[in-house]
Amino acid sequence: MEKQYRVLLYYKYVPIEDPEAFREQHLAFCKELGLLGRILVSSEGINGTVSGTVEQTEKYMETMKADPRFADMVFKIDEAEGHAFKKIFVRHKKELVTLRLEDDVDPNETTGQHLKPAEFYEKMQDPNTIVIDARNDYEYDLGHFRGAVRPDIEAFRELPEWIEEHKDMLEGKKILTYCTGGVRCEKFSGWLVKQGFEDVAQLDGGIVTYGKDPEVQGKLWDGQCYVFDERISVPVNRVEHVIVGKDYFTGEPCERYVNCANPSCNKKMICTPENEYKYMRSCSHECRTNPRNLYVKEHNMTEEEVNARLAAIETEDHAAAE
């Protein structure tokens, strides 16, 4: 049975003359339709994820495609049980994806070769190919292409510097890169080309498109794909499911992300329900004892209950150390 809601993922690098005016009009349009989601608008284009009913999302796509600027924009469509967002945000930003380069990249002028999923699948297996994940470390940790390089970065803007520091591993290699939907790779692969790397290609449509492709069926992907909405993750490999995520506290296989309950920390952690309970969804003793701890507030824990949990953790830590 077809689900009543859908999630749309899309982007388009195209000049938008007055992005602030566009932002205001677009927000009003989304509210009128009843869509929820997060949309970024800049002078270089649009990048968004929205959720709504089948009717609402159809109307949105139809209206967008009627605008010559977005006539050929590709929408990746996921069925959903309900909304994937709580609110609607349309924000004006300087860049669609933040790289802060001195010499900016226009993907309409310079970008890596686009590979369809079947081509990407084949080239990934070439021994002279290096596959670079263009996402953040916490996205990689939940799932990635088998054998892909994990840049040690917490934000996309850190990627060029990481590449500069690890240039040796790329010398003489064919470079493949990928991200969730393709918007980051358009710029990143273009930056690689401008740096003088000659054989640079990107996964057209990103991981989301790869997972839906009827030919490759998500093969050679391990784990889940992190997404920036209420779903947190979506499956990719339809042939086999290999769990690569590891619980923050015990290292056991796990694919469940939570945020540290200390709001000033908010660290993303892969964590089982049992360990969320045991450690009060907090990454450290400092976060567990923080007076603003959200887990304590959500569960209306008394001081005695908190101290009992802390004592249990301390007892186990001592036992493990002996």
Swiss-Prot record:
Catalytic activity: uridine(34) in tRNA + AH2 + O2 = 5-hydroxyuridine(34) in tRNA + A + H2O
Keywords: Oxidoreductase, tRNA processing
InterPro entries reported for this sequence: Rhodanese-like_dom (IPR001763), Rhodanese-like_dom_sf (IPR036873), Rhodanese_C (IPR022111), TrhO (IPR020936), TRHO_N (IPR040503)
Residues annotated as catalytic: 179 (cysteine persulfide intermediate)
Alphabetized HAMAP family for the sequence: TrhO
Similarity comment: family membership: Belongs to the TrhO family.
GO MF, one example: oxidoreductase activity, acting on paired donors, with incorporation or reduction of molecular oxygen
Keyword tRNA processing among UniProt keywords: yes
EC number(s) reported in the record: 1.14.-.-
BP GO terms, sorted: tRNA modification
UniProt protein name: tRNA uridine(34) hydroxylase
Xref: PANTHER family: RHODANESE-LIKE DOMAIN-CONTAINING PROTEIN 7-RELATED, THIOSULFATE SULFURTRANSFERASE/RHODANESE-LIKE DOMAIN-CONTAINING PROTEIN 2
Gene3D superfamilies assigned to the protein according to its UniProt record, in alphabetical order: 3.30.70.100, Rhodanese-like domain
Matches recorded under NCBIfam families: PRK00142.1-3
Top-rank lineage group of the source organism: Bacteria
PROSITE patterns documented for this protein: RHODANESE_3
Function, in words: Catalyzes oxygen-dependent 5-hydroxyuridine (ho5U) modification at position 34 in tRNAs.
Domain Rhodanese: 125-219
